[in-house]
Amino acid sequence: MPVNMVSASEYRRILVSDHPIMDARAPVEFTKGAFPASRNHPLMEDEERRLVGTCYKQNGQQAAIDLGHSLVTGEIKQQRLDAWQRYFTKHPDAYLYCFRGGLRSKLTQQWLKEAGIDVPFIEGGYKAMRQFLIETIDNAASQNPMLILSGITGSGKTDFLLARNDSVDLEGIAHHRGSSFGRYHEPQPTQINFENALAVALLKHQDSQAKHLLLEDESFLIGRSALPQAFYKGMQQANVVVLEEPMEARLTRLLNEYVHKMHSGYIQRLGEEAGFAAFAEYLALSITGIKKRLGGKQHDEFQAIITNALNIQQSRGDTSAHIEWIELLLSKYYDPMYQYQIDKKAERILFKGDHLAMHQWLDAN
């Protein structure tokens, strides 16, 4: 009887299409790393997996299989099967995998088939698909010429990238804007999940037939998400285009990003009082994150201005007082740092211009 299995040659199609996948690994494995379109419905919970693994090391495969069957039986087995059936009722074309595409995949497939659901498992499982994605990242620079979008803080680089189909939004994947004030409301992904999502985005970009791979100018770390070494090296060697924007527009944009969006996000998640407190803490922690660069005296001045702006905002609903510390942050910290960094890239710069001019240049080149 032929094995109902999706071959490794299908990895690209599965990942690019966001094909639904049921991940039968234990929750601890799934939490460490998974794929964007996968959902965890385990064959074994964490403790069951640990016991079976210990048995395998001490007594061999058959003893481990027997223990697994004794642990997942009766009502427990039925509960797992019910969860799988609900998933495949919702996603009738989904696949399944375990870590290596081995015993767990085959047993899950067998139980589903006995319940009247015939589901293919993926050859090689998570491990082989993960390796495929690692190779995708390592080969990214050779697949499509990288082009780095630089620009002074507040110039709207992310908004610009999102308006184009030849870009990959690294900050969106990392859930962080890459600066001291760059934290999102939701937590950052694990390093493995960041890499997996990046690789899937690169595969989709390759399929778009874009002329180049447009990426925002980033440090090695975006928050706590580290760019893979080979990928970052490619970025450091790539040509650069520079987005320019007047100060007034930058201040308006940063007031919206640092104040309006963050404040409303915290309020939405935590309610009025707790949300405002969390927003105030976000600003305090962000400025403290650059205390060493600012120096103690200047840091204290920033904190005083921020506290005053928060008091005005809370009492009057007026956010305009925040402009003072944002403008100071640009002049004292971000702009000098940017100038130092862009000077080092001078020989790689191909074009400078505002949003409209940049779109026109990229479309023509």
Swiss-Prot record:
Catalytic activity: 5-methylaminomethyl-2-thiouridine(34) in tRNA + selenophosphate + (2E)-geranyl diphosphate + H2O + H(+) = 5-methylaminomethyl-2-selenouridine(34) in tRNA + (2E)-thiogeraniol + phosphate + diphosphate; 5-methylaminomethyl-2-thiouridine(34) in tRNA + (2E)-geranyl diphosphate = 5-methylaminomethyl-S-(2E)-geranyl-thiouridine(34) in tRNA + diphosphate; 5-methylaminomethyl-S-(2E)-geranyl-thiouridine(34) in tRNA + selenophosphate + H(+) = 5-methylaminomethyl-2-(Se-phospho)selenouridine(34) in tRNA + (2E)-thiogeraniol; 5-methylaminomethyl-2-(Se-phospho)selenouridine(34) in tRNA + H2O = 5-methylaminomethyl-2-selenouridine(34) in tRNA + phosphate
GO molecular function ontology, one term from the record: tRNA 2-selenouridine synthase activity
InterPro entries in the record: Rhodanese-like_dom (IPR001763), Rhodanese-like_dom_sf (IPR036873), SelU (IPR017582)
Keyword vocabulary terms for this entry: Selenium, Transferase
UniProt-listed Enzyme Commission number(s): 2.9.1.3
Gene3D superfamilies for this protein: Rhodanese-like domain
Domain Rhodanese: 15-138
GO biological process: tRNA wobble uridine modification
PROSITE patterns listed in its UniProt record: RHODANESE_3
Active-site residues, as the UniProt record annotates them: C98 (s-selanylcysteine intermediate)
Function (record text): Involved in the post-transcriptional modification of the uridine at the wobble position (U34) of tRNA(Lys), tRNA(Glu) and tRNA(Gln). Catalyzes the conversion of 2-thiouridine (S2U-RNA) to 2-selenouridine (Se2U-RNA). Acts in a two-step process involving geranylation of 2-thiouridine (S2U) to S-geranyl-2-thiouridine (geS2U) and subsequent selenation of the latter derivative to 2-selenouridine (Se2U) in the tRNA chain.
Similarity-based family: Belongs to the SelU family.
Record note on quaternary structure: Monomer.
Protein's name in the database: tRNA 2-selenouridine synthase
Natural source organism: Shewanella piezotolerans (strain WP3 / JCM 13877)
